[in-house]
């Protein structure tokens, strides 16, 4: 117990846990540290009471440089720091908050994202919102089914060997070859049709994009209708199949049988099944209107009145008599037409329809999808019959016929084709191209007029049929059409005005030439009504008035060319209008068609116009801003020119004043007393002679008028016995009334580099009115060095009889007396208390050599930074600095000419051995020695003593962090400066370098 009792009396160090028995110690609250333990735990940097440091919760010390910075605001954290465990990022308590709601994060529960920190509530909301949008995106994603590939049944592909059978030629039908289908082929099937089941497979007139053959848009439309079985007539179809197996059809068009596009067989219901599986596409706007379902019932047009009794009514048992009557009233009228020779009706096997090429079938299915909604209209079924006039499809080669067949049994039904009414939008835009050029001699028959009126009435209905699906009585034209399905025919006008049909085959061209007709009517697109009902084709191209034109409306595409449709009389040629008028009207038609835009294009035009207006407004704003900027630029240019002229005048004035000041310095004037009769005594003001730079550089001086007392300043110089240098003395301010000789002259004071407000010993001294007195007592006291802050270094040394001033030696001895002072961090860099420094300066100024022979003990118990401040301040207040004004320019020229900063750089605060062994170093050293020889002896000794002291301080640079170059930065402003003070910024680097170079190599330079 006796051994531990003494240890309990001593405090223990917080860091090393050892007892503090001797020496100094740092105390912070109840904790104590050794002086060597009071350091940063990271960088081991020694700390002091003036250092910026923090005490961690563990008791460890950390300096300001090593402390954590906030990740958000970037400021040093001087209190509580929150460090994230995942990223090791530090946040201050103010920045540790949610970036969404801005609330502080409680309980250190957070979520870190790329956007920043989130509290848990905001993070959960963000996750829920993201999940909701992903689910919504997944629901809205559409996957449209792809078009099914047509299935080709190879089991039914039998080659069709057709033998040509020449049917009986009639007066109204030219000869055409038909094929007799052998008994080994698949029996044809009788199909019961209904208007609701009829869907065209291929109608190019409504979709120009599918027409890849380059044919005309209107005259080259090909329509292939596939008639599928009705769902509620299955038994009837099966009976027809059985009867068709016993007696297959014997006749078929030779060209249809031999067409390569009909080489594959498919079940008759295959197209219907594919239609049911195909998704409906969006159709254009003109096909959206549909008639009611009750009206979608076609009427059968019979060949004879006798056969009309055998045709069963449409299979729709759910409809009552009133509905049937209404549908009949709203449907096209039935026309009974006599067939002069019904046995020669062109028929073909519907089994061959399924034998189409897959490419054609796919195209057919695509067109079915596009036209399904448009073609559910009331239709008229007309039994195919022979005609003695050329069919309309024979002229317009690309409009396909719809074929049907039936056997001669009692149950068999005449297969008819669908003739739905033309679209209202198409028919209302028809107009004759020959308006105004009609032959006045040609008159239409009453039947033709009735047909014209009926066609106009039909245009008012929602007719969706092409209007060109008429029975083909010209079998040669039909053969040409079927034979050239792969290469669709082109219609063009020849030079002689005849209509020519060209195709890939020469035979088709020749046959078409032989069967082209001339219409006696000059009215284009107008069909004359024949005299007999046998020549009537219901709902083909309706007769039009001359006021109707072909036009493009609502996005529907029709032909821009005008074709003359032959009448139903046997005439050999087609009459066309004049070619010049045709070209002129075609251009007019093109302009009219282009002038009408669809709604989407109109919307785009409106949007584009809106954007154009906005751009024009922005352009006007930019132009106005540009004008304002140009005005400002012009004003700035004029201002710049005015400033340049002022600067030039000021520079010339400055140079003149500088020359005057040099003359005054070389020839210091004697200040004489000016006396005028009964004028009041003149006051002489003497100020402390410090040439230290003021805070505001006196570059301009005030002009005094002749009516006021003029001020004159002069810089007095005293030539010493030992040196030739001129020591600047304190300026003397003399005020005197203006005399008669200089009343009209403006006096300009010379530049003075001092700030009298900086010194405490400024006092006003009255001047005796004695003309023989050269200078005042204060001037004599100033010149002998008795005044501390006003005497030159040479005068002060002579006054004290010392090699260096006492204030310098006392300060240096105090700093070097204690090793702790030399290790103090930031020595000469940190500033002491200004009040204490001024108090010490007053004590040094009051000390007199004659009264006190001993060195004063002024710096006892003073702070280190206060003592270093007194030393630096005395050097800075010297009227002529240590490196005098006379050697300033030679030193700067030496540094710049030798390029010492580039060739002899400081590395780690000192010159390297390689640099010291270079020729540049040797030449620079010798030149520098020659320049420093011009210094006064007192300046030279002070420079050497100061260099030795700086070397001792740099030995402790590991502790005090003050290298040679850092100390040079501190001392350079007080040791070297130019006389005018204008080159402080320009020569700053050179001044700092030369001071560091001399401090580091003073042993070689200051010998």
UniProtKB/Swiss-Prot annotation:
Keyword terms of this UniProt record: GTPase activation, LIM domain, Metal-binding, Pheromone response, Phosphoprotein, Repeat, Zinc
SUPFAM superfamilies with a match to the protein in the record: GTPase activation domain, GAP (SSF48350)
Domain LIM zinc-binding: 13-66, 70-122
GO MF, one example: GTPase activator activity
Biased amino acid composition, Low complexity: 212-221
Region (Disordered): 203-293, 401-478, 505-600
Residue list for modification Phosphothreonine: 278, 532
Highest rank taxon of the organism: Eukaryota
Bias (Polar residues): 250-261, 270-293, 467-478, 529-579
Ranges of Basic and acidic residues composition bias in the record: 454-466, 583-600
Residues with PTM Phosphoserine: 291
Domain called Rho-GAP: residue spans: 791-1006
Site positions (Arginine finger): 829
GO CC, one annotated term: cellular bud
GO biological process: actin filament organization; axial cellular bud site selection; budding cell apical bud growth; budding cell isotropic bud growth; establishment of cell polarity; invasive growth in response to glucose limitation; pheromone-dependent signal transduction involved in conjugation with cellular fusion; positive regulation of pseudohyphal growth
Result of changing residue 98 to S: Bipolar budding
Disulphide bond pairs: none
Keyword Metal-binding applies: yes
PROSITE patterns found in the cross-reference section: LIM_DOMAIN_1, LIM_DOMAIN_2, RHOGAP
Pfam families hit by this protein: LIM, RhoGAP
Compositional bias of kind Basic residues: 411-421
Matches recorded under Gene3D superfamilies: Cysteine Rich Protein, Rho GTPase activation protein
Note: Present with 396 molecules/cell in log phase SD medium.
Function: GTPase-activating protein (GAP) for CDC42 and/or RHO1. Negative regulator of the pheromone-response pathway through the STE20 protein kinase; acts at a step between the G-protein and the MAP kinase module. Dominant suppressor of bud emergence defect caused by deletion of IPL2/BEM2. Involved in the control of polarized cell growth and proper bud site selection.
Protein name (record): Rho-type GTPase-activating protein 1
GN (gene name): RGA1
